[in-house]
C-alpha cells in the first residue's frame, strides 16, 4: 500500500483554537450600523394547503419594517440541477416541515421573533408521503401532480419519480462473476451538507 502524505494521517486544524474558544467570527456575529434583523415563519405541517396567512398583527408591532409572504414576489422555482421544485417561500401549499412561509424584517432580533409569533396561518392538511419506496410504488398521492411542468424535468417517469441516474460502469455481470465476495445491503446514512460553517 502506498505511503500517503495526507490520506489516513492525523492533522492539526489551523482553525481549531478559534472555534473551541468561541473567538471565531461567523456571519451571524456580524452587525452593521442600521442593519435590520430577519426571522422566518416556517411550516409545522408536512403537507398542507395554505388557506390563509394573516400578517396584520405582525405588521402593526412597533419596530417591524416589513413582512413578506410567497405572494409578495413573482412565482419562481429553484432546486437541484435535476429539478426545480422548490419556491423561496411557500405559495398555496407547504411540502415539508420547516418550509418558509413568511419573513419579518425588524429593528432587532427580539422584535422580529415576536412578530413571527403573531402571524396566523390556517392550513388544510393533505396526505403526506414520507417513505421513498412507497412514494415511487404508485400507491401514494403524487406530491407534485404538475411535476412534468417543472423546469429541469428531463425524464418522463411520472408520479413521484422525477429523475433517475444510472451509475453502472463496465460489465456489471462479469464483475460479479469475477468477485471473491459480493455484499448486497441497504444502508441508511445521516443527511450531509458540503456547505460547512466557516469563520469569517
Predicted segment positions?
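Structural alpha/beta core scaffold segments of enzyme domains
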Residues: 1-200
